[in-house]
């Protein structure tokens, strides 16, 4: 009789532990999420710098146009160039293109603003998630981000997230050097997104299992996010990165999948394909649109500059921008008085 009593007591203890374990997020995954957030913030710098390059190319086109006009006025257009025979048509085309390029440049700037905004929103969603988890820490073994010991993760364990003691003021800002450096990396958006996929991280780098850390933020059953009930719908962190069924009791059995793959009340899914996560879809679409518009404008400007360059006289080609403006103004004044 005593044997069965002890066995039942042990079984009861195991069941109780299973139902009430509140796992913590692994600091490895938290740092990866923050690294992605930093990269997304860097997109704002990237689109701005690439837009500035296109603006410079358009300015160069205008200078080439002035060089050509000076060459025509001084009768110094290279006579051997077949493409320079109909110089009047070429000039008309250039002037018409300059107006078109200004409109396309404005379209590119609008596209860059939308891409930067989408990236900023996505970065904010990720940052808020990790910030909430990092702050959810008690003085003992109760916390929501784990480094595998009985103490919570501190800022030195989350250096991809915080530039000092955990707090809102130490989150990396868009003007910080780390963000600017991220913008200069040659990594493509899809590469950075894939770094947080389930297959890239693995379950052991996402959730600390087998320990009760008291983190109610990863529990949707009663005694979790709400006091005495399960939720009435599925739940997500990071806009679709970490997804929970509506009644997850703890001891997470995490698998790869998306928010729409959470088919049972106790399922937990970490994104397998970040390009399907809602907050990243706009970034992918709008950044691709910016690149498309930018590349089209750059190609047209280059073609026009190449056509102009063949017909510019050697002396005009050697003039600095200041010299060009000065001589062009002199000739315009002379023509005005004729």
From Swiss-Prot:
Glycan-modified residues: 26, 110, 234
Q: GO CC annotations?
A: ciliary pocket; plasma membrane; side of membrane
Q: Give any single GO term for biological process.
A: symbiont-mediated evasion of host immune response
Membrane protein topology class: Lipid-anchor; GPI-anchor
MF GO annotations:
transferrin receptor activity
Quaternary structure and interacting proteins, as annotated: Heterodimer composed of ESAG6 and ESAG7.
Q: What is this protein called?
A: Transferrin receptor subunit ESAG7
Give the originating organism.
Answer: Trypanosoma brucei brucei
